[in-house]
Amino acid sequence: MRLKKIRNYLDKQGWKYSYTEEEGLGSIDFEHRGLSYHIWDFEDGGYGAETNVRTVGRQEDILGDYEEEIIEILKTW
């Protein structure tokens, strides 16, 4: 199971989400205040995540400690 820290955060907030895993990589889709969000982790010489949590209309890649960075963004909501 991937994206465990993010899934734990979403569970604590009581936010419903769908989680899928393919080829060992995780994907989370959820809605918040009527907007759809996506977090997809990838491996390309290192792990990262593609997400639209910072700017709902635009995808961005987050590298390094991407789960913590995404959680910090979610905390600002």
What are these regions (language model features)?
Residues 1-32, 50-68, 72-77:
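Negatively charged, low-complexity tracts enriched in Asp/Glu with abundant Ser/Thr
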Residues 36-53:
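Short, conserved beta-strand/beta-arch hydrophobic-aromatic motifs that form part
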